[in-house]
Every structure is written in C-alpha cells, then in structure tokens.
Amino acid sequence: MSKTNESLLKRRQAAVPRGVGQIHPVVAERAENSTVWDVEGREYIDFAGGIAVLNTGHLHPKVIAAVQEQLGKLSHTCFQVLAYEPYIELAEEIAKRVPGDFPKKTLLVTSGSEAVENAVKIARAATGRAGVIAFTGAYHGRTMMTLGLTGKVVPYSAGMGLMPGGIFRALAPCELHGVSEDDSIASIERIFKNDAQPQDIAAIIIEPVQGEGGFYVNSKSFMQRLRALCDQHGILLIADEVQTGAGRTGTFFATEQLGIVPDLTTFAKSVGGGFPISGVAGKAEIMDAIAPGGLGGTYAGSPIACAAALAVLKVFEEEKLLERSQAVGERLKAGLREIQAKHKVIGDVRGLGSMVAIELFEGGDTHKPAAELVSKIVVRAREKGLILLSCGTYYNVIRFLMPVTIPDAQLEKGLAILAECFDELA
C-alpha cells in the first residue's frame, strides 16, 4: 500500500501530542537544496528552510560528506567525559566570528532554547544578579525559562501556569505599530523605577531582528543606546542570534551590522546545516563564571553535529554565502515591492540580508492586521508548490527563510507563485 500524506498524518495524530503543531498537511520524504518532495511525489519550493535551519540548503554535499567521515571515527563520548577535536575546533571558529576584540570562549549545546537557558545561567553567575529584561514580541524558546522570556502567551505558554520569576518585559521598538525607540528605552527606565533596580538586573536579552515576533529589524541607533544603558548599570547584553545568525542577515552575526558588541551571543539553527547544535559565545571571563560541572549536557556539542557545523563554516567561505545572502535578500525585497505596488494590502516590506518579511493590513490600515488573508495565501501557495511560513504577534506577517543557496531561477519561480496568490486572493 502506497503512503499518502493523509494516511501518515492520521498516524501522526494518533501517536504525537497535539501540542506539536503542524503548519502544512504535508509529509516530506526527501529534499535537495531548496526543493522538497512529499511522500506522494509532489515537488515544493522551500521558502521556509526548516525555520531558518537550512541557509546552506537541504543536504549540502560538503556537510553530508563531513558527517559521513565523522561517523566513521566517533559518534559519541559525552564531551565532559572524553573530549574530541571537532568540539574544540568549532568553539574556536565560532569565537573568531562573534564580534568583539577580546578573548572569547564558546559553550556548545543542542537546541536554541538550551543556548538561551545557558546564557541566562552564565549572566546570573557572572553578575551575581537574578533579573532579566526581555521584550514584547520576543521569542526565545519553549523551555520554562525561555517561555518566560518569550513575549507571546498563545500558543506557547497558555495554560501552563506562572512562568519563572525575575523576568521583566520592556517594549520592543516598532515604529509601524506606534512604539518609538524613545518609548522602548523609557519602558526599561520604568522597570528600573517600578519593578527592579538596575543593580538587580543581570542581563537584557534581545533578538537583533525579531524572529517569530514579525522580523522587525532593530536599528543601529537603538542597539547602541541599549548597549550604553547596559554599560551604565553593569548589565550584560545578550544577543539572541538563534534565527539571525549563520549568515541569514548578510553577515555571520547580525550584530556586526548594528554597531554593538554583545557580552554573550546565542546561536543555533543554520550553524548546524540541518544537524542539532547550538551554543553561547562571549567574553572569556564571563563564560568562565560557572564552576566545572555547571555547564554541559549528555549530547551537548555532539561530534557529528560539530562536524556538520565546521563544514557549514567552510561552505560559507568557499561559496561566498554571506554575499549570496545579501544578493538573495535584495532580489527578494525588490520582487516583494513589485507585488506591493499592485496590492496595497502589503503595508511593509522589510528585512536585513535575506531575513525578509511582508506585513499585511486590511485596506492598508495598520490597525487592522490581515491575518486571515495571510493564512489563505500560505495555503494557496502550498497548493501551487511553494512552502511559506507566517509569523507575527498578530499573525499577519509572511516571512521568507529559503536557503541562500537557492538557484536564481527557483527564487524567481517562487516569487511568481506568490504574485499569483496575491492576484487571486488580495
């Protein structure tokens, strides 16, 4: 009996908790670069990239070769028991790429949430303080601490009770929705006045470009003001680059373009080229704040994932993927603005590098998010062979996270499909 999407999704429903969501009713069978085929043989252009995990594409040959070579040597020891060179080398290479002219160290773990959890642990240990300030619209993960940091309750933490204490919420700057940079800084000052003194705050954590929140790009001026505020009060600045990192924004880390040096940087997703690896990198004296045994994990920094990540770094250099990311982003934004010129429902085209999004409003009114239309476009695009992702606090944003290795012809085809969807539905 041949497999179908429907039959496998029925099995999924019976076997997998409903809390594990499903964006598209599709079961993937194989993939290559920016193309995915489902179990029924249908072909899709992938503008989702596993949610920013596949900047180097599905199954990049050099990444797969590195993994195969590592599998022939060593699959696991637990780094805390027996060290191995791929972890050490990757820690060195990430430290070279993190902004800052000072000694750095790198912790490797497995998921983005785990990286953020450890960044908070390190910040608290280094400062002797407990408080953390995060922003409205932020997304930092699905573990309890990261849920507390995340600035959206539904669907992430609804019904789960109180989140961990010591977390305070500042306004994220977003001129489109009436929150200026001054408003954001003032909201932090209000926290200092009303909720926690500056000397009780260990860290401020921020995404250089908000991910799930809607791809709002923080300006260079705002990031510099935030850096100055942290320096004034001895607060550590954590840049959550889980989604922005690994070249998505046209530089390896987005903060390179924003004029600031974070104390700690988290990374994950595309660093592993499809393999699970993440980490925290930062000033050596801060990273060393926790005593031996306080950091790590059984699978943290798997030798297989480290081999994949090292190959990803080489691919970025050999194939000039930072430049390619910028070029893909420029063409993408130009194509989206062409669609916008015909359809005023697109209120904004924005992004940094190839981390690009469009935001839709009914009748062009920024007080009326067009969430229903976004949902319809995502469905129609899939029916036409294009995989899209939505996001945003109001569910009215379409984000684009295709591999930066996508061929030009396929990028153009994807844009043409998207234009058709707007012509039919908007």
UniProtKB/Swiss-Prot annotation:
Cellular compartments per GO CC: cytosol
Keyword annotations: Aminotransferase, Pyridoxal phosphate, Transferase
Single GO molecular function: 5-aminovalerate transaminase activity
UniProt entry tagged with the keyword Oxidoreductase: no
Binding site residues for pyridoxal 5'-phosphate: G112, S113, Y139, D240, E241, V242, Q243, T298
GO biological process: gamma-aminobutyric acid catabolic process; L-lysine catabolic process
EC class of the enzyme, as a word: transferase
InterPro entries: 4NH2But_aminotransferase_bac, Aminotrans_3, Aminotrans_3_PPA_site, Class-III_PLP-dep_AT, PyrdxlP-dep_Trfase, PyrdxlP-dep_Trfase_major, PyrdxlP-dep_Trfase_small
In-chain residues carrying the UniProt-annotated modification N6-(pyridoxal phosphate)lysine: K269
EC numbers, comma separated: 2.6.1.48
Reaction equation(s) it catalyzes: 5-aminopentanoate + 2-oxoglutarate = 5-oxopentanoate + L-glutamate
Cofactors (names): pyridoxal 5'-phosphate
Family: Belongs to the class-III pyridoxal-phosphate-dependent aminotransferase family.
Free-text function comment from the UniProt entry: Catalyzes the conversion of 5-aminovalerate to 5-oxopentanoate.
Protein name listed in UniProt: 5-aminovalerate aminotransferase DavT
Source organism of this protein record: Pseudomonas aeruginosa (strain ATCC 15692 / DSM 22644 / CIP 104116 / JCM 14847 / LMG 12228 / 1C / PRS 101 / PAO1)
Gene designation per UniProt: davT
